[in-house]
């Protein structure tokens, strides 16, 4: 099967209508043609700045517009981020993702963010950040610091998007993806299933992703985690078979991409997760929490991988024998060398 960038809604709907087993069989054939079988890439996601986000994403408990149990937190100090990254590496993660609840980062944030990137890279981990919208210059700064991936989800179809978010446009998201690509970074972009969207909207999301000039290197498919206090807390649950179908179709449409089984895994039993891996998912987030939502523990994941004969992929960055204390010393030196009086503990929530 060739890699394409001209998918139509009709083609995706045809895939949706295929018998379930036939669809999974096709997806598995594509997966075996383009991907390493029985291997899953493992990432860890850390919230480096939580809550008080000015945006109105109806699914998100970090929005300042909704009353949830999430308390706002300042930008995490670099040393704490590196400590979490070291623990993630020790637990088997190969990529460390850092997320901040912002509409976009401010210039005062950039030195701290670049120090985080450099410190995590020194550990031999791949790096990823999700910080909201970026300007071209901010994208270049992150790339120059060594950031490997930037996550910026499209969330849903262009047609349904306005029902979920009004504080930034769909084009804003596409523009940020262009800035990231132009800066030389890899793209992580996907969406959320279960927000009340139609089958046509799910098809539209995949068409938008698959028809980008270059497919995202990572495509996270999230199942909505309903949080009390958000406008979507009472939306209907996603049918598991519909979700698995979306994984399979994403694999068929974007055969070279990593398809990540992302948020919502805590609500999936082992059988559903196994079918997602059969359908072509080959990446997961690892650890007990994804930003602010629950995630299966490392032990549960390792037990499932063992049952399925799945081995997590090895670290793809250069091996690094630097001790944790030396890494922290490097960060302290970088901070001390900055021509600024800004404190690492400034309140980034305002």
From Swiss-Prot:
A Pfam entry, by short name: Radical_SAM
Class of the enzyme per the UniProt entry, highest EC level: transferase
The keyword Hydrolase is assigned to this record: no
Keyword Cytoplasm: no
Catalytic activity: (4R,5S)-dethiobiotin + (sulfur carrier)-SH + 2 reduced [2Fe-2S]-[ferredoxin] + 2 S-adenosyl-L-methionine = (sulfur carrier)-H + biotin + 2 5'-deoxyadenosine + 2 L-methionine + 2 oxidized [2Fe-2S]-[ferredoxin]
A biological process term (GO) from this entry: biotin biosynthetic process
Origin superkingdom: Bacteria
Sequence ranges assigned to domain Radical SAM core in this UniProt record: 38-256
Biochemical pathway: Cofactor biosynthesis; biotin biosynthesis; biotin from 7,8-diaminononanoate: step 2/2
GO molecular function list: 2 iron, 2 sulfur cluster binding; 4 iron, 4 sulfur cluster binding; biotin synthase activity; iron ion binding
Details of cofactor binding: Binds 1 [4Fe-4S] cluster. The cluster is coordinated with 3 cysteines and an exchangeable S-adenosyl-L-methionine.
Keywords: 2Fe-2S, 4Fe-4S, Biotin biosynthesis, Iron, Iron-sulfur, Metal-binding, S-adenosyl-L-methionine, Transferase
UniProt function note: Catalyzes the conversion of dethiobiotin (DTB) to biotin by the insertion of a sulfur atom into dethiobiotin via a radical-based mechanism.
Family: Belongs to the radical SAM superfamily. Biotin synthase family.
Subunit relationships: Homodimer.
Protein name: Biotin synthase
Gene that encodes the chain: bioB
